[in-house]
Every structure is written in structure tokens, then in C-alpha cells.
Amino acid sequence: MKPVKVGICGLGTVGGGTFNVLQRNAEEIARRAGRGIEVAQIAMRSQNPNCQITGTPITADVFEVASNPEIDIVIELIGGYTIARDLVLKAIENGKHVVTANKALIAVHGNEIFAKAREKGVIVAFEAAVAGGIPVIKAIREGLSANRINWLAGIINGTGNFILTEMREKGRAFPDVLAEAQALGYAEADPTFDVEGIDAAHKLTILASIAFGIPLQFDKAYTEGITQLTTADVNYAEALGYRIKHLGVARRTAEGIELRVHPTLIPADRLIANVNGVMNAVMVNGDAAGSTLYYGAGAGMEPTASSVVGDLVDVVRAMTSDPENRVPHLAFQPDSLSAHPILPIEACKSAYYLRIQAKDHPGVLAQVASILSERGINIESIMQKEAEEQDGLVPMILLTHGVVEQSINDAIVALEALQDVVGKVVRIRVEQLN
């Protein structure tokens, strides 16, 4: 049987890894796919690719690959929202299947892209867009297809996890660790997407759509970064038996879908709380399987290439199948996607960690307890430290039971108005992940 011909657009870290894996494991991949896979053309701008290329035609124009009549599958690895969107739509228009590792593209333009792919009867595969080398999309879309998914939670950005691990283990401040992450290549020169939760929100949007059968709605995801976290809060959380992780949470409720990325206290004895460094993990709770955990490298040349090539093998296997019988892009049949609303963060329910800096005066705790009680907020535990020598302020740390966020917001306004409370109240959400 003739080999399937693919074109790779983008030969950076992931593109170079993909080319290397395809060359190194060509025989094994052909045995799995049922046909050989040949790289027929590469589009790249760099003069210093991350692999050795001999004999493969090269172009600087990605659209040349999308229009090449010899190519069956286009692998999009250029990143970004704009040119990548145009490239993928052009490839689909020309009847080519697409494999991509572009989470931003899928989260923002996925609904449009999938509709066009259905119209043209082609496949768009995107396992590598979420959690690098962890096949979590396949696990949710296929392995857990018997389940009604209740919730999922994930550490899905390695940069943020590296920073929080260093802050906890070595007592280092956020700016110091961020600088090291940039020097090591874990964070970009502009780290906004990583440290403000945007990258994780792209990935969470994709996972939530597959888990709950809803359209992609990245614009409704709540994002909160880790730039304001201090070593003090990391240490207080540890003393209370928790660890702070930058967590993406998607939960099905009677009112709608929670879709949120933010710093989160997790009990230290949970497996996911012990995922450290640049590693990723996603926990999924289904009504039949219960809780399952998927762990591995969330980025990197070959881990991500593993998912790209895995998708490529799946596409080759499915190329001759009836399009109506293929696994749907978002796990559910397109006409069965639900219109569940995405809840605003104020309507989401969580337990909370609150840190209050108070003057060392009698009666402050009673005032704090009264404000919380008036708003139906129950206190689970309180930790009060000695007054700090420099300013004489007493750090007061509280853990609450679960409550709607709007109630906490109202309580914080009242707490910050107290004469004996100084500065802003620190608020971090708590998830038990039972």
C-alpha cells in the first residue's frame, strides 16, 4: 500500500521532535498504522531546525504545503491564532486531514474549524494541544466514554508548577523563580500566558468541551494567575496540610458548568498535590470509573511529538472509514452538544483560604467571625500567628467551608473596612478533590 504523505508546518521544538520520531520509529509506526508515513514537504522559517533534514523538500510558505496535491495530512505546528487558523482552514478546504498541537487555535477557533472539517469529511486531531505527552484527550473522549463526567481538575502548565514547587521547597520568591524559569527555557521572555493562567485556560476549555459535550467557550473561562502569591501563603498552606497548585477546574453543576483557572489549596496527601516541577497531571471524575489520574510531561520536544505522531497514526487508520463513523472531535455527536451555560466565577462554589493582617487588639477575631457568619460562611479552622515584630500585625489564617464566591466577595469588602484590618485580604480557593 502506498505510504501516506504528510507535510509539517513549523520545525521548531515540537516540529523537530515530530520529524525525529517519524524517522527514528518509521518501521514501528508503519506496523501500527498499517501504512508507511512519509514526510513529503516541510515549511519552516528557521535556518537552524531542531533536526537533520536530507532529501525532504523545504519551503518558507506554509500555504504551499496546504495546497500541495501530494499531501494527505497537514501537521500544523506554527502556533498562534491567525496564520495557523488560515492555514488549517485552507488545508481542510483542500480536503486534507489536520494534526495540530495548537491549544490556542483549538480553544478560540475550534468550533469553526470542526464545522468546516465535518463539511469536508476530514479529521482534525489535537491530542498534543493539551498536556504534551499525556494522552488525556483520548482517555476522556474514548476510554471514559461510558461515563457521565462530573468534574476534572488539572495541573496543565509546567511553568507555573515549576515556580510553585520552587517557592514551596526552597522558600524562593516568585520573581526570582520566574527569572530562573526563563533562563531554563520553561517560560517565554513574555511569560504572561503561563503565569496569568491563559495557557491553562486554553487547555481547560478543550478538556471541558470533551468531558461535558459543550461547545468550546474560551471567552467564558475565568483565569487568575500566580503572580501575587507569596512564600508566606505557600508556607501557611503547608502548615495547614495543603499545597498550592495553579489548577484548572471544570465541574458540572445543576446551574451550569464551572470553568476556572486559579491558585488552589489541595490537601497535601492527594496524588495531584505531589506533582512537582514541570510535570503535568489531570484528574477526571466519572460516575462509573470514579476518579482517575493522568500524569506525565506536559511539554518538551519528544513528549509532545509523541502525541502528534500518535494522532497521525489514528488519522491514517481512520482515513478510509466513513466520516459518520469516526470519533467526534469533541467526543459527542455534533448535533448532541449541550447548551449548558458557563457559570460566572461569582456563582461558583468553593471553600476558601483567607489571610487577614490585623492589629494586635482584643476582639478582632470576634468581628471577623461575625462578618462571616452574617453571610452564611462557616469557618472550618483558624490559625493565628504571633504578631510580626516589624509592624506589630497579627496574621490570621482561616479556612472556610464551601460557599458561593459572591458571599466571600461581600465578606472581604466588609473585612477590609474594619479599622483593625490592614491592607488587602488574601483569598485562595480550596479544592478537596475527593
Regions found by a protein language model. Name each.
Residues A84-N94, K103-R141:
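Rossmann-fold NAD(P)-binding glycine/threonine-rich loop
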Residues D176-N274, M279-A281, G300:
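Substrate-binding/catalytic subdomain of NAD(P)-dependent oxidoreductase enzymes
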Residues H262-D287, M301-E302, S373, N378-D391:
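Low-complexity, glycine/alanine/valine/leucine- and proline-rich hydrophobic stretches
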Residues S307, L312, V316-N434:
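A conserved regulatory-domain signal marking ACT and ACT-like small-molecule sensing domains
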Residues R118-D199, I206:
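Rossmann-like NAD(P)H-binding beta-loop-alpha module
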Residues M1-N94:
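N-terminal glycine-/serine-/threonine-rich beta1-alpha1-beta2 phosphate-ribose binding loop
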Residues H97-V99, I379:
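A short hydrophobic/small-residue beta-strand
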Residues I58-A60, S67, I75-E76, V99-A101, ...:
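General beta-strand structural signal in soluble alpha/beta enzymes
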